[in-house]
Amino acid sequence: MKLILLGAPGAGKGTQATFISKQFGIPQISTGDMLRAQVKAGTALGLEAKKHMDAGGLVPDAVIIGMVKDRLTQDDCKNGYLFDGFPRTIPQAQAMKDAGVPIEFVLEIDVPDSDIVERMAGRRAHLASGRTYHVKFNPPKVEGIDDVTGEPLVQRDDDKEETVKKRLEIYHSQTKPLVDFYGKWAAEGDAKAPKVRKVAGVGSVDNITKSVFEALK
């Protein structure tokens, strides 16, 4: 199973990635982890990436694709792999296609923006203990107060409504073109093109997981 998993922040992509990984015995591949590993190991690609990072720039796609190809030669990828959060842009998707990185499925977990805003903007946290609540789905006994210490709860900056909406805007502007890119490739009748699937990410986790596995048949 070789797939790319797409989903907005707060869509529950991480949960489904874990289930897919376990079900098919494949690793989740995160470019952030790859970058850190290569920089730490001092490889040629790692040193090249570090040069750009130290200068405050973005690591060029060619370097990232080099790392991806290197990562896919490792033993744990023999049954496949799951790309989470990559590619993010058309040039990255095109570079993967040009490099001949095999992909069987592109799966998007689709959740309406209004649901994501409700999920994320309703989160409250007790920072000292790491306990989290939700004003609607998992409220504290007393509004705005931690159940254990009686201390006030806070809303993290990342969970503020305007921040969530901004992140969703960025996600849609990047992801819609990606889905179109893979859809167009599949429409050309190329046997190497992945199948593009969309699953509704609302409802119980079990039902979403069932839909995910159904889509990957």
From Swiss-Prot:
SUPFAM superfamilies hit by this protein: P-loop containing nucleoside triphosphate hydrolases (SSF52540)
NMP as annotated region, ranges: 30-59
Primary location class: cytoplasm
Keywords attached to this entry: ATP-binding, Cytoplasm, Kinase, Nucleotide biosynthesis, Nucleotide-binding, Transferase
Any GO MF annotation of the entry: adenylate kinase activity
Region (LID): 122-159
Record InterPro entries: Adenyl_kin_sub, Adenylat/UMP-CMP_kin, Adenylat_kinase_CS, Adenylate_kinase_lid-dom, P-loop_NTPase
UniProt: AMP binding residues: T31, R36, G57, L58, V59, G85, F86, P87, R88, Q92, R156, R167
Pfam families the record matches: ADK, ADK_lid
Written domain comment of the UniProt record: Consists of three domains, a large central CORE domain and two small peripheral domains, NMPbind and LID, which undergo movements during catalysis. The LID domain closes over the site of phosphoryl transfer upon ATP binding. Assembling and dissambling the active center during each catalytic cycle provides an effective means to prevent ATP hydrolysis.
Biological role: Catalyzes the reversible transfer of the terminal phosphate group between ATP and AMP. Plays an important role in cellular energy homeostasis and in adenine nucleotide metabolism.
Family: Belongs to the adenylate kinase family.
Protein name as it appears in the record: Adenylate kinase
Organism: Dechloromonas aromatica (strain RCB)
